[in-house]
Structure formats: structure tokens, C-alpha cells
Amino acid sequence: GGEIYGTIYALSESAHEQGVIWTGSDDGLVHLTRDGGATWQDVTPDAWGEVMVNEIAVSPHDPAVAYAAINRYKFNDFTPMAYVTRDYGENWEEISDGFADEAWVHVVREDPRTPGLLYAGTETGIYVSFNGGDLWQSLQLNLPNTPINDLIVHDRENDLVVATSGRSFWILDDLSPLQQAARDVPDGDENSHHLYSPRHAYRLAGGSGFGGGGEGVNGPSGAVIDFMLGEVAD
């Protein structure tokens, strides 16, 4: 079996309530304190068995909601497993439908602007769910097939920042089309057409150029307009 040491792998402090902290350990336990660590409650579901709790993330919209990414890769079991609780750990629900085989999950985080819009980093890539985890789909685009160790939505820019294993940092510019799709596009309507509201663009005055080179790749200049066609025209 896999070696475990009772090590805390995940710690998440609530942004809603002072003193509320979640922890997850490599022996599969989840604990919750609501008094700043004076007392702890074991809220581990019995169904998990021998797992490692890789990450716990509190919902930015609901203090009772938390997402847990767990795995059994140390036992040569690469099944993707993600869970959500909506009542401070009293009950847990698995939300793993749609992940590829062996794409075990490193992290699940909820979009800070759109409830129910979730992003997941797995061992083989990145996923998105528009319905609170009921169904996941790939958000890979041109991202290399590499483990996604963590991800975060940039507060000001509204970009998705991704930390990979061995392939550097990647940024998905402007999440507003995904946020609008989660709110406005009819779920499962393949014939839906939608024009997304673009984010602000800036026209800059001329100035002296920068003579040096750079390693990064900037996004396109000007306004970017995103749209969805339910049916591709001939």
C-alpha cells in the first residue's frame, strides 16, 4: 500500500467567517474548526476509504460549501475523484462525471464571479464545469498535457492562472465568456447562438518602443469579441 504519515496536505481558511478552517491530510481525513483551531471536528465521509486529500477549497459564494480533490495514486489507483459538501462537511457528494480515465484530480476551485462555475486541475490537464460539478469537460485548448498543480482566478484581470508541473505558468485570458455561458446560455442547447459581452479594451497613445525581447506571449491587441454558433454555416 501507499505510505502515509498523517501529514496535512491541504489547509483552507474561510473568507466568509473568522476562525473557520478546513484541513485535509494524506491519510484521507478532513477536519473542520469553527473557533480558530481551539476544537476540531472530523467531517471525513466513510465512503472515501484510503485516500489522500490533495486540496480543499471553500466556495467564494457560500460559507457552507467546500470542494475536495482526493486521490489514490499511491495505491496505483488513478481514478479521478472530486467531492463537494454544502453543509460544512455533514454530507459529501461526488462530482467526478466527465473526467478522463486516470486524470486524478489535484484541485477544484469555484469561479469567484459566477456560482456553480468550477475549474479543476488534474494529472493530465484542466477541466471546467458549468453546473456545479454535475458534468466536467476539457478546457485544455493549447495547454500542454501536463499535471495542473494549482489554479486561481486573478481578481483584477479576471484571468485563469495555472501552475503546471514542469511546463511553467499558463494564463487563460478573460474568463467572461465562460462566466456568461454559465449564466446565460441554455444548458445543453446545441442550437444556441450567443454573442458575449467583451471586456474593456484600451487604445494607447504612441510612445517610444521597447528595444528588448521578451519570453512571454501577450494577448492580441484591441477588443476581443467572443461568440458561439450553435450550427456551423456551410
Language model: regions and residue ranges:
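Short edge beta-strand/loop segments characteristic of extracellular beta-sandwich folds
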Residues: 224-230
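Short solvent-exposed strand-capping/beta-turn motif centered on an Asx-Ser/Thr pair
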Residues: 73, 230-232
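Extracellular acidic loop/turn motifs
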Residues: 16, 232-234
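Beta-propeller blade termini and top-face loops
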Residues: 1-213, 220-223
